[in-house]
Amino acid sequence: MSEKVKFEKRESLKEKPDTANLGFGQYFTDYMLSVDYDADQGWHDMKIVPYAPFEISPAAQGLHYGQAVFEGLKAYKHNGEVVLFRPDQNFKRINNSLARLEMPEVDEEALLEGLKQLVDVERDWVPEGEGQSLYIRPFVFATEGILGVRSSHQYKLLIILSPSGAYYGGDTLKSTKIYVEDEYVRAVRGGVGFAKVAGNYAASLLAQTNANKLGYDQVLWLDGVEQKYVEEVGSMNIFFVENGKVVTPALNGSILPGITRKSIIQLAEDLGYEVEERRVSIEELFNAYDKGELTEVFGSGTAAVISPVGTLRYEDREIVINNNEPGKITQKLYDTYTGIQSGKLEDKYGWRVEVPKY
């Protein structure tokens, strides 16, 4: 039997929000998981504590030099059962991110067990409505109070939970407008593009704001060397349907290896679609569109799962894909993926991990 994580009970519980108006990342549960690290003890003192502000040194290295990584995954409730979706993949990826920033890796099994116990404590916070979930945010940051530029000797890991509404506000997929960024770059090979580090997202905000001002929802990034090849969207990996084939940029060290991406590729192949992972130039996409060969575009990520792209703008040209409607392949993949997540469809892959009652 797994060892029980220490539990610090709060005096009173919060009033839970109206599940009809959850939005994303606006509400937080009563408790969080906390783990500390120092060079002598390693990772230690895992405990479930009340969600609350905490003290940190003004000289904490994470504030100055950016040693901070995070993850995002979800828990679902179906017929009273609470499950996590592919949490092992998230903890493998957080270790890859930690290693890249010279931060101490975590015990994946111990952390998964701690997460299960946290979600069990908070199972009443898991919404059960269509498309709703409990968003899970693990993150690690340097806490040692010293201004020397070196790897910190002290860190904190927290996991916070946020009940979240349906991304689209219902069952119908809604197409997004994407701006292809040709001035700024997100990442270069040899850098940290493959890692889920805080700085990647900070560096993307200016381009994202500029795109929003022009009426676009997100930015599609090109490679950082030639600014010719498509890489990823701000919060999603990207897929194209060309001549009936599902095409996505190959992982090259500057693209985040999305867990949803990985799952979608496997589902697409099992549904009988031909999948290609390769370099995709922006010129190829617009040429394929002109020939009538580019029929669908969609993004994949934890928040939206699948987000159809209806409009794509590059330089002074804007194209509308599939009359701004989700394509058949996009819809099929979305329905299958979310069906497995929610428990409505059989999970032959073992992706759903049950949260036991401790």
UniProtKB/Swiss-Prot annotation:
Gene field: ilvE
GO biological process terms on file: isoleucine biosynthetic process; L-leucine biosynthetic process; L-valine biosynthetic process
Database matches in Pfam families: Aminotran_4 (PF01063)
Homology family: Belongs to the class-IV pyridoxal-phosphate-dependent aminotransferase family.
Pathway listed: Amino-acid biosynthesis; L-isoleucine biosynthesis; L-isoleucine from 2-oxobutanoate: step 4/4; Amino-acid biosynthesis; L-leucine biosynthesis; L-leucine from 3-methyl-2-oxobutanoate: step 4/4; Amino-acid biosynthesis; L-valine biosynthesis; L-valine from pyruvate: step 4/4
Main enzyme class: transferase
Cofactor: pyridoxal 5'-phosphate
Species assigned in the record: Staphylococcus epidermidis (strain ATCC 35984 / DSM 28319 / BCRC 17069 / CCUG 31568 / BM 3577 / RP62A)
Listed name of the protein: Probable branched-chain-amino-acid aminotransferase
Its biological purpose: Acts on leucine, isoleucine and valine.
